[in-house]
């Protein structure tokens, strides 16, 4: 599904990602874990075709980025950390608009929106203005727009930041359900998030890949994920900051 080979990205003279290589096969939930500023958002933007790498090769569903960005984007549903919502629209209006932007055929839009709304638990709020929704429901709307067009790959950037505990539980449950039908990449700096939903983990530190593997592999020898993370990243978990990445 995703092949990344010797990927680097710099902003001027400042490197954000350095010589990164990894492969994501189909059908699992992958966690991209790292402290704020580790390069996660830069990688998300490259994988979704919104940012060109400085060096290296990236393929999504067999399409090379950025040369075949249009074809690759058709295979990807993306939820950025700040969902692109329009508060003056109703949920239904917004999802129909998003379906149109994604090229869903007019004859299929209402049915696809209906099914996606049901899948993401939005049935009862479809007539409501987005501005009237709780943050948890707004996040569901963001996930719903990512699912429109039936993409093979779902990319979620910090999907539970700012949610209350009950909302976090519900969104994590939804992500696990998505993993049954899609390949999912979840970017987070929250250790418990990755432990709760991910089957494979890539740990980043200062723009480099520090470790990768299953949770069982990373925590072999009775070590906790927190201990492994602190050792690899210099002890900066930043779990409670909600701070944006300085990329």
Regions from the language model: what does each represent?
Residues 212-213:
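ABC ATPase "signature
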Residues 96, 100, 107-125:
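Conserved ABC ATPase "signature" region
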Residues 56-67, 71-72:
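Conserved ABC transporter NBD signature motif
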Residues 148-152:
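A short, proline-enriched helix->beta-strand linker immediately N-terminal to the Walker B motif
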Residues 154-158:
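Catalytic Walker B motif of ABC-type/P-loop ATPase nucleotide-binding domains
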């Amino acid at each position: 599904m995703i092949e990344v080979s010797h990927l680097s990205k710099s902003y001027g003279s400042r490197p954000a990602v350095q010589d990164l290589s990894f492969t994501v096969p189909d059908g699992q939930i992958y966690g991209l874990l790292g402290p704020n500023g580790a390069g996660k958002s830069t990688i998300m933007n490259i994988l979704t075709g919104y940012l060109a790498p400085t060096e290296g090769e990236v393929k999504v569903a067999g399409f090379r980025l950025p040369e075949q960005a249009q074809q690759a984007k058709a295979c990807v549903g993306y939820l950025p950390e700040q969902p692109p919502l329009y508060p003056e629209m109703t949920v239904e209006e917004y999802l129909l608009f998003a379906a149109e932007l994604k090229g869903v055929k007019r004859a299929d839009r209402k049915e696809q929106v209906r099914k996606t709304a049901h899948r993401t638990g939005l049935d009862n709020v479809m007539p409501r203005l987005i501005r009237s929704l709780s943050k948890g429901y707004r996040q569901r709307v963001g996930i719903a727009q990512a699912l429109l067009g039936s993409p093979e790959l779902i990319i979620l950037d910090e999907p539970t930041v700012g949610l209350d505990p009950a909302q976090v539980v519900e969104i994590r449950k939804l992500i696990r359900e998505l993993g049954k039908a899609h390949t999912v990449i979840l970017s987070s700096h929250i250790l418990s998030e990755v432990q709760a939903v991910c089957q494979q983990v890539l740990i980043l530190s200062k723009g480099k890949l520090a470790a990768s593997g299953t949770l069982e592999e990373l925590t072999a020898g009775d070590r906790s994920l927190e201990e492994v993370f602190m050792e690899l990243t210099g002890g900066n978990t930043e779990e409670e900051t909600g701070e944006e990445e300085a990329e």
